[in-house]
Amino acid sequence: MAPAQALPGQATDFTYYLRTTLSAESRGFDQILLNSSAGLEVTGLRVDGAAVAVRAVIEEGGVRLDLPQMMRRSALVEIDFRSTLYLNQTRFDAFLLNSALGEAVRQQADAGDATPEVASEAVAVALPAGRHLIDELRLSAPLFTPNGDGIGDRLGLEFNLLMFYLPRPLRVEVFDLGGRKLRSLSQTEAEAGRVGLEWDGLDEGGRLVPPGLYLLRVEAVGDAQTETVSRLVGVVY
């Protein structure tokens, strides 16, 4: 598949190359299952360079592609899809199925040189080497006005959580400038992915905080490191 590398947290277009080699006795296939721990959206499929209309069915752990007719010949199949990755070496595994035989009968595609036009033979995508667990922390605004008028009443925050192969502790908290914790927005275990939260301007007791500057702190606890990222946010009326 290509490309073999991607940037974390950014939607990337990939192409998966399958070289099918079928004998005269083969019953062929009319379905392709593309499995991954990452979500994906199939945008096109070609057989020997010719576009083929397929039906994409979302299944647990991947997407099943239903071909319009049985494939009983050797060919180069190219699957275009879009995915956003948060884990290094995310795998994409392809399986060939014959609908007449049921889903229990499947042939996994082996990694290898499907076409000389693509240098990569891998079925996993690498992310750039780095030590960050938290990436692309963004606030909906530098300040907000939680006065109940329905305009700018909530502060939104989003960030990428990277390299969490298993659920790990994630804490998102609000402090005043004196270091006193006012509100916990998240104290749970999370997996790698895009995280979105909101603060309504209230403290833990449900009281509206006074106008001023506050510190928003995100802390991710990994196996080998703990990373903390902070942002200042203003509350005004």
Residue spans of the language-model regions?
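Extracellular/luminal low-complexity Ser/Thr/Pro-rich, glycosylation-prone repeat/linker regions
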Residues: 1, 93-130
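Compositionally biased low-complexity segments at domain edges in trafficked proteins
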Residues: 1-26, 126-148
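Extracellular acidic, Ser/Thr/Pro-rich low-complexity tracts
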Residues: 18-24, 34-38, 83-85, 160-165, ...
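A eukaryote-biased signal for long
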Residues: 30, 34-49, 81-85, 94-100
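A surface/secretory-pathway sequence property marking extracellular, secreted
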Residues: 37-75
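Low-complexity, intrinsically disordered segments enriched in Ser/Thr together with acidic residues
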Residues: 64-97
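Short loop/turn motifs at secondary-structure boundaries
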Residues: 73-75, 123-237
